[in-house]
Amino acid sequence: KLIVLIGCGSFIMCDELNRQWPDIPMILCGERDYTGPKETMIREHALPRTERIPISDLQKKYNLTLMQSSVYLNENLQLMKQLIPKMDKVMYIGDETYICQQNDYDLSEIIREKYPELDYQFLSAKDIRTDSLFNILNHVNPHTTGVIFSSWLYKSSPHDNIMRSNSHRVISTAPIPLFSLRAIGIEEEGGIVGGYIYNKEKYNARLLETIHKILDGTPARNIPLYYPDDGAPVFNYKSLLQRDLNPKLCPKGTIFYNMPPTFWEKYEYVIISITAAIITLLFFFQYLRLQSLSRIKRLQQQQLDSNLKYRNL
């Protein structure tokens, strides 16, 4: 048996799962390497530093390991400042889920400590209706404001316990560029232009490798916590242009989706075919030239032999 928990909010289930199946191996997949008091997590409040419990401490009690799907908050802010040189304000679009509340808490803290020149605003689905969000975004100056989009889950009424998503509508109709902390939505042309994210293919491969190790008998607690070290700027080239952002401002090493092919990529096969044809023709003409020279040489030799023959007479 093996349990994979997805999302930081699910980490509070470790105690109950361990009680149900003692020492069952667990893999925690989430954006943070800590959890907190169950009561705080259930209320979906952000965890201040004083309440955070490192996952490494849980390994002493539970048979688990961590696969952190890192969110690079500081790197994304640096990236936004690079693409929006006149940026003086950051907006974060999220909802009342725990991870959005935690991102809001951490973003406000980072901006206060490292970017005091920036204003910050959290737009939450808990407090703002979708139509009101569009009205706000329509009045945003994209040359001075950077917007990070996370998710847009909401309740249709205060008594509704079901969270509904309107993320697709927000992304597809947003009139401004939306930066993201995750890879979702970047490959498609639209509102999400990109962000600083980890390599999801490598992450998935490492997750499968970890699963196989545990199923082969390695205790989960003996597997080191995994932190991606391959974060990089990832952007949709066409989305950048559609949202009036200059791809040339992206840092070196940026990964682009939908980037137009270079001259070589576009005409590679044509160039190779023409080059091959020219080389073939050159070889053919060289062959004809050698044949002609050989024929002339034979005629000259015949003429020389004839002259010698007549001279001997």
Predicted ranges, named:
Residues 66, 116-218:
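Membrane-proximal low-complexity regions enriched in glycine and acidic/polar residues
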Residues 36, 47-54, 65-87, 199-216:
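Hydrophobic alpha-helical segments within soluble ligand-binding/sensing domains
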Residues 56-111, 225-236:
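An alpha-beta-alpha
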Residues 5-9, 29-32, 68-71, 93-97, ...:
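Structural motif
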Residues 257-303, 308-310:
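Alpha-helical transmembrane signal-anchor helices
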